[in-house]
Regions:
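Conserved C-terminal alpha-helix-loop-beta "cap" of PLP-dependent enzymes
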Residues: 2-32, 36, 116, 166, ...
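Conserved N-terminal alpha-helix of the aminotransferase class I/II PLP-enzyme fold
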Residues: 3-20, 49-103, 114, 125
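Polybasic, low-complexity association/targeting segments
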Residues: 22-67, 190-195
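Short, glycine-/Ser/Thr-/acidic-enriched flexible segments
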Residues: 48-49, 242-244, 258-260, 347, ...
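Buried hydrophobic packing segments
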Residues: 104-112, 275-282, 417-427
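A conserved active-site cap/scaffold subdomain adjacent to cofactor or substrate pockets
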Residues: 249-293
C-alpha cells in the first residue's frame, strides 16, 4: 500500500455515524476519542470503551507493516481469524467479519432468507441493540419480540419468558415457517434469554425448521461456552468492542458446519485495525489462570454490591442467574456477573427520570467540574427498565481484569470503582428534584 490515512482516521473509518467524531468534541457517539485516555476510569464496557494504549500501539504497528508491505490485508485477516477460532478449528466453523453486532444479525437472517417464509423470535431491542429489528427487517421476515422485564422494570421469570418463546415458535412452525430464534447471552443488563435448555429443546424438536443465533455480542462467555454453542449447531455473534474493550464497531458472525460453505465478509481496513486492537486484550485475558479471573470478579462484585447497598441514592437491580445447563456443566468464570445495573434515586425516594439519568451519565465523562473527584468516568449507557426509568450499568471488562493481576492492581480497581460511584452520587445530588 503506497499511502494510508493516519491511524486515528482509520480507527473510525467505516461510514457509520455512531463512530464518526463530533467536530467540536473529537468524540464519537459513545463519548470515546480515537486515541487512548489512560486517566479515564472506564467501567462502560457494556456499551463502548476507549482504545487501550497497547491496542493503539498494535494497530499503529499493523498500519506500518501494511505501508511497507511486510504484511498484507489477507494475511492479517487470516491471523485474526485463526486466533478467534483457537481450539474450535476442528469444528469447520466459518467466520464472517462485519462492522457491528447489528450487521451480524442481518447476515444471519440473510443466510436463512431463502427458507421462505421466515419468522424471527428475538429479545426486545431495549436489552440487545437498538438497530437490530430495522436491520433484519430488510429481508422481510415476520418478527416477534419478547420482553425480558415486566412493566415495573423487574425481570420476568425464566419460565414466563421460555413459555412465550415456545408459544411463538410453535405457532410459526405450524404455519410452515422456518424459525430463527435469537437468544441473548448476555443482554445489556447481563441476562440470558430464553434459557439455553429452552433453545436446545426447540432445536431438537424442530430440527430442519429451526435455527438459533446466539447474540453473544457482549462476548462475556468463556471459550468452553463458545465451543459448546458451536457444537450445538448454533450461530454465534460476538464483538471485540464490549468485554474486550476494543474500539467500537468490530464484530464476527460464527457459522457452524451446515451453513454456507463460503461467506462474504467485510474487508474494511478500519475494521481490521479495530480487531487488531481488540485482540491485544483478548490475548492478555486468555493468558490468565481461570482461578485468578474468578477471584478478581468475586472481589469486585463484593465491593460494588456493598457500595450500592449502603447508599439510598442507588438501587441495584436483581442480578440474573447465568445458568448454561444443559449446554455444559463445568464451572467457569462466565457464571459470574460482570454487569451490575442500578437505578439512581433522589433523596426523597423518587427515581431519577430517564432524562436525568442520561444527564448524570453524560456529566460523569467530563473532567472540568469542581467535584470531589474530577476524573473522567465512564459507565454503560442508561437502559430503559420500566416506565420513565433507566438504569446505569457498572461493567467489568477483560482489560480491567488483566490490569488487576498486576502489583496493587486489585487495590486500584476497587479504588477506581468507588471513585466512580462517589462522583455518581455527587451528581445525583445536583440534579434538580
Amino acid at each position: 500500500m503506497r499511502d494510508l490515512p493516519g491511524i486515528e482516521a482509520l480507527l473510525v473509518a467505516g461510514d457509520d455515524a455512531r463512530i464518526a467524531l463530533d467536530h467540536l468534541t473529537g468524540l464519537n457517539k459513545y463519548g470515546c476519542p480515537p486515541r487512548p485516555d489512560p486517566e479515564q476510569l472506564a467501567f462502560g464496557s457494556s456499551t463502548a470503551s476507549v482504545i487501550s494504549q497497547s491496542g493503539y500501539a498494535a494497530a499503529a504497528r499493523l498500519r506500518e507493516r501494511l505501508l511497507d508491505r511486510t504484511d498484507t490485508l489477507e494475511l492479517s485477516w487470516q491471523r485474526i481469524r485463526q486466533e478467534l477460532l483457537s481450539d474450535n478449528s476442528d469444528l469447520n466453523v466459518q467466520l464472517a467479519f462485519v462492522p457491528s453486532g447489528t450487521d451480524a444479525h442481518a447476515l444471519a437472517v440473510q443466510h436463512l432468507s431463502g427458507l421462505a417464509p421466515l419468522s424471527v423470535v428475538m429479545v426486545e431491542e431495549s436489552e440487545t441493540g437498538s438497530g437490530v429489528r430495522a436491520a433484519i427487517s430488510c429481508h422481510h421476515p415476520q418478527i416477534n419480540a419478547v420482553s425480558l422485564r415486566a412493566a415495573d422494570g423487574m425481570p420476568r421469570t425464566s419460565e414466563k419468558i421460555d413459555a412465550e418463546v415456545v408459544a411463538l415458535v410453535e405457532a410459526a412452525v405450524a404455519l410452515g415457517h422456518h424459525v430463527l430464534l435469537v437468544m441473548v447471552d448476555q443482554s445489556k443488563t447481563g441476562m440470558i434469554a430464553p434459557s439455553i435448555s429452552c433453545a436446545i429443546a426447540l432445536s431438537e424438536r424442530h430440527s430442519e425448521k429451526f435455527s438459533v443465533l446466539v447474540d453473544a455480542c457482549q462476548f462475556r462467555i468463556a471459550p468452553a461456552t463458545l465451543r459448546a454453542y458451536l457444537r450445538q449447531g448454533f450461530m454465534v455473534a460476538i464483538t471485540g468492542s464490549k468485554f474486550l474493550t476494543g474500539p467500537a464497531f468490530s464484530a464476527v458472525l460464527m457459522l457452524p458446519e451446515g451453513y454456507a460453505q463460503r461467506v462474504e465478509d467485510c474487508k474494511d481496513l478500519g475494521l481490521l485495525l479495530r480487531w487488531e486492537a481488540a485482540m491485544v486484550e483478548h490475548r492478555r485475558f486468555c493468558a490468565l489462570e481461570q482461578s485468578q479471573v474468578i477471584r478478581i470478579m468475586e472481589n469486585f462484585a463484593q465491593v460494588v454490591r456493598q457500595r450500592l447497598a449502603e447508599d439510598q441514592r442507588f438501587e441495584l437491580l436483581p442480578e440474573p442467574l447465568l445458568d448454561r445447563r444443559p449446554l455444559l456443566t463445568e464451572e467457569s468464570w462466565d457464571r459470574l456477573p460482570s454487569i451490575f445495573s442500578f437505578v439512581l434515586y433522589h433523596r426523597k425516594d423518587r427515581p431519577l427520570t430517564r432524562e436525568e439519568t442520561q444527564r448524570v451519565y453524560s456529566l460523569l465523562q467530563l473532567s472540568d467540574m469542581d467535584v470531589i473527584d474530577g476524573r473522567r468516568c465512564q459507565l454503560g449507557q442508561p437502559v430503559a427498565i420500566g416506565k420513565g426509568v433507566s438504569a446505569l450499568r457498572f461493567a467489568l471488562s477483560a482489560r480491567l481484569i488483566s490490569d488487576a493481576i498486576l502489583p496493587k492492581g486489585m487495590d486500584k480497581l476497587k479504588d477506581d470503582a468507588l471513585a466512580v460511584l462517589e462522583k455518581t452520587a455527587w451528581l445525583v445530588d445536583r440534579i434538580r428534584d
